[in-house]
């Protein structure tokens, strides 16, 4: 998906989304971030991505967080990917809904 990879780079690697899903993973999925600035920025970035690329770029964002090594243990990894899959829903991106990707 070279097009989606390019979009990922154009939108600063969805840095705000990475921050949001990392916090969700580290805090055990607590919902206190639901209205935070990271989420607002993330949703704005996500809305600029072509619809077919929304899930692929979120998957890339999750992988980038894994490679940075701040996510510890299988539970945090699960939470990380769950948070990433849910973002289109949380950001209310029409016609995308929840992403289907798994860890790999």
Swiss-Prot record:
An annotated Gene Ontology molecular function: nutrient reservoir activity
Disulfide bonds: 4-53, 17-42, 43-91, 55-99
Matching SUPFAM superfamilies: Bifunctional inhibitor/lipid-transfer protein/seed storage 2S albumin
Pfam families per the UniProt record, alphabetical: Tryp_alpha_amyl
Keyword terms: Disulfide bond, Seed storage protein, Storage protein, Taste-modifying protein
InterPro entries hit by this protein: Bifun_inhib/LTP/seed_sf (IPR036312), Bifunc_inhib/LTP/seed_store (IPR016140), Napin/2SS/CON (IPR000617)
Keyword Transferase: no
Function (record text): 2S seed storage protein having sweetness-inducing activity. This form is not heat stable.
Assembly notes: Heterodimer of a small A and a large B chain linked by disulfide bonds.
Family assignment from sequence similarity: Belongs to the 2S seed storage albumins family.
Protein name per UniProt: Sweet protein mabinlin-1
Organism: Capparis masaikai (Mabinlang)
Highest classification ranks of the organism: Eukaryota, Viridiplantae, Streptophyta, Embryophyta, Tracheophyta
């Amino acid at each position: 998906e070279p097009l989606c990879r390019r979009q990922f780079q154009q939108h600063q690697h969805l840095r705000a989304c990475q921050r949001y899903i990392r916090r969700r993973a580290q805090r055990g999925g607590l919902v206190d971030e639901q209205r935070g600035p990271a989420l607002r920025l993330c949703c704005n970035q996500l809305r600029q991505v072509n619809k077919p690329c929304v899930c692929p770029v979120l998957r890339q964002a999750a992988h980038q967080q894994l490679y940075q090594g701040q996510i510890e243990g299988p539970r945090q990894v699960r939470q990380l990917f769950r948070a990433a899959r849910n973002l289109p829903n949380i950001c209310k991106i029409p016609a995308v809904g929840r992403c289907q990707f798994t860890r790999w």
